[in-house]
């Protein structure tokens, strides 16, 4: 991919996992920047798959703050296997905001606080949102999936202590 001068590419893969829905959940992030790979994961004891997918994207964009300042602007490509996240942030969020965070049938948007946070973070950067088919052999997505499951295990380990 050809980038304009003064722009650095950040490639991000995110995933969420949930054992039961609601149930124990985890999120995972694989971030690639300047030849370096950074990985993050976490989890919650009672959550949903959609909340974990959203939290993965939020944690990924928050992680951009910790990247070294190269004096160049960042172009972010975020890959998710969640159409809920990809379509939500690319298409639906604009209508939700116009309607006061209500859906087309006038119901409150689920996970509103997370959507607001993701919307705010995504406006700080030049983010392109991509949907990838999950569990289809895509290296970045497979890695994010493994990290999300590690997030679930981390919660189970805490419960066992």
From Swiss-Prot:
Pfam family, one: RNase_H
Annotated keywords: Cytoplasm, Endonuclease, Hydrolase, Magnesium, Metal-binding, Nuclease
Subcellular localization, as worded in the UniProt entry: Cytoplasm
Disulfide feature: none
GO MF term list: magnesium ion binding; nucleic acid binding; RNA-DNA hybrid ribonuclease activity
Cofactor: Mg(2+)
GO CC annotation: cytoplasm
Enzyme class at the top of the EC tree: hydrolase
Binding site for Mg(2+) 2: 15, 145
Cofactor comment text: Binds 1 Mg(2+) ion per subunit. May bind a second metal ion at a regulatory site, or after substrate binding.
Residues spanning the membrane: none
Gene Ontology biological process terms in this record: DNA replication, removal of RNA primer
PROSITE patterns tied to this protein: RNASE_H_1
Enzyme Commission identifier(s): 3.1.26.4
Binding site for Mg(2+) 1: 15, 53, 81
Catalytic reactions of this protein: Endonucleolytic cleavage to 5'-phosphomonoester
Domain RNase H type-1: 6-153
Assembly behavior: Monomer.
Described function: Endonuclease that specifically degrades the RNA of RNA-DNA hybrids.
UniProt family annotation: Belongs to the RNase H family.
Name by which UniProt lists this protein: Ribonuclease H
UniProt organism field: Nitrosomonas europaea (strain ATCC 19718 / CIP 103999 / KCTC 2705 / NBRC 14298)
Gene: rnhA
């Amino acid at each position: 991919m050809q980038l304009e001068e003064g722009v650095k590419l950040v490639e991000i893969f995110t995933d969420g996992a949930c054992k039961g829905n609601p149930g124990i959940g985890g999120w995972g992030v694989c971030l690639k920047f300047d030849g370096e790979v950074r990985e993050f994961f976490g989890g919650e004891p009672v959550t949903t798959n959609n909340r974990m997918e959203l939290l993965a994207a939020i944690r990924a964009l928050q992680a951009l703050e910790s990247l070294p300042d190269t004096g160049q602007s960042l172009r972010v490509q975020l890959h998710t296997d969640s159409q809920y996240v990809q379509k939500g942030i690319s298409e639906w969020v604009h209508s939700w905001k116009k309607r006061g965070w209500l859906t087309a049938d006038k119901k409150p948007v689920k996970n509103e606080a997370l959507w607001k946070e993701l919307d705010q973070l995504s406006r700080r950067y030049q983010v392109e949102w991509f949907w990838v088919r999950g569990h289809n052999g895509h290296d970045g997505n497979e890695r994010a999936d493994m990290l999300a499951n590690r997030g679930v295990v981390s919660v189970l380990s805490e419960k066992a202590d």
